[in-house]
Amino acid sequence: MGEPGGAEAAVSARLLELAADDNAAGLGELLAAWPSLADEPAPWYTPARGAEPLTPLMVAAVYGSVGCLDALLSPPYLVDPNRASASSLSTPLHLAAAGGSASAPAAVSRLLAAGADPALLDHLQRRASDLVALPPNSLPLKNHLLSLLGARKEWPPDPSLPDIKNGAYASDDFRMYSFKVRACSRAYSHDWTECPFVHPGENARRRDPRKYHYSCVPCPEFKKGAGCRRGDMCEYAHGVFESWLHPAQYRTRLCKDGVGCARRVCFFAHTPDELRPLYVSTGSAVPSPRGALEMAAAAAAMGMGLSSPGSSSFTPPLSPSAGGGGGGGGGSGGGGAWPQQPSVPALCLPGSAGNLHLSRLRTSLSARDMAVDELLAAAAAAADYDGLVASPASIRSARGKALVPSNLDELFSAELAAAAASRSPRYADQGGAAFSPTRKATVLNQFQLQQQHSLLSPRAAAVTPEPVSPMSSRLLAALAQREKMQQQTLRSMSSRDLGNAASLLVGSPVSSSMSKWGFPSGNPDWGADDEELGRLKRCSSFELRSGAANGNHEPDLSWVNTLVKEPTPEKMMTTTSAMDSIGILGQNTSRDHIVGGEDDTAGVISSWLEQLQLDEMVV
């Protein structure tokens, strides 16, 4: 590590000596071996300044070494002529004017031709023209030097340079987002003030407002001249170019000179038509995020479509000067050598509404997109379905929960229990007709047709509907499953009375409690005592239990007495076998419920009722 650093220091010191002696040949040979040291400073001692780190170009300017200046300012080195010393902020132009060399005017001419800025100030706020030091007998030479430093350099017309006052380079988008932001690609010396691109060491350099989110307010630290400690990450503008070319402030005020303005790049509008809109909420040409959100909400409420998802509400309108001249001065045909710059995207500041996904406003199906007849049909279907439910209080409590298989027993038992309370033993009420398979199929078909009609309607054709919610899909599946269960139960019944009892058992709490059948002691007991047989004899049909529970009058059961007789020992064995089958069936039902087979509950009940009916017929 020490040897390479010492070698570079020795080479840098040797370069300074060659530049002071104006040895252009030796300087070129050494730079060919060490090209990276062409613009590297090294300590140099002068009687007036003492030891100060200077570059080879600065030393050549002090001693008026014109040959070395030409070598350093030409390709392939292209040393920056505006680089300032770290200690005194002196540029090569300051050193050439204060050097007192006889060839100082030639050195100053070389530096000005390379783009040196005579308006730069040193640490004492002095220009290069303030440091001219020549003997008294060299008054003509001094006047010539002052004329070079005081007068603005007039460059010959360069057709390759774009016209910054006309064409695409004078448009609002280019001025706000590209002027003095993009690096210049020219390898030869030219007038920086006529070039719209940034150069190394140029004071007009700007940060890209699309990359660095800063405001148009000037930075208080940068204005003091000491530089900002935050650098490019500062939230304030550094310099007049960043402040006045900011999209929030550019051309929001009228120029005091009007159409007679002679500035090459003016930050103000020259006619009222060139003024960019100023938003009162922010005091600038950029709307506030709250205003943008309110505008987007208003557009959505009015049914206004957005042009594209990527369009930003911050895009300011282009001024009329975007396509034509922005002032005087003829165009110089720069468009042929320089291609047109692509359109710059709109500014997207933090928290802007442009970052929001506004496409969701177009994909939500609301009542605005449905016709009046569709709304009436949907409301009628909802009211019809609510009218089918017998117990509104219990169903409202069930709707508040997720529709899962564990809630189906609760949901359907509440419906059927309320319906059974108002029925006669022979289906005297009309509530059963509302729960008939034909009625439920009609309601489901009407609901599906309404959904298809709403999707195919002209107003909803341009809107992408959201997927059906899980609640509605589960409700439809539950209704279809319940219809299937009732159809299977009704097909398996052989009498109207048993059908009534089965319809009550499917959704009643008895069905949910069947899964808990078992033996309290844990050991199976397949025997039957006299009390159980007597209870079986007295309760030969489920309708008797239903009627007794509801307080209804007992119907005529004379036809049952003809079938029921006193049991004999042989028939006792038959009854015991029937009870064995019932116990095994209860175990299977409990096992199916544990595994998750609630869908087969209706089939289990129907098989159990058929077996019971056959046993009664045998008895």
From Swiss-Prot:
Residues 308-341 are annotated as: Disordered. Keywords: ANK repeat, DNA-binding, Metal-binding, Repeat, Zinc, Zinc-finger. Residues 322-337 have a biased composition (Gly residues). InterPro entries: Ankyrin_rpt (IPR002110), Ankyrin_rpt-contain_sf (IPR036770), Unkempt-like (IPR045234), Znf_CCCH (IPR000571). GO terms for biological process: regulation of gene expression. A zinc finger (C3H1-type) spans 213-241, 249-273. This is Zinc finger CCCH domain-containing protein 67. It comes from Oryza sativa subsp. japonica (Rice). The lineage of its organism: Eukaryota, Viridiplantae, Streptophyta, Embryophyta, Tracheophyta.
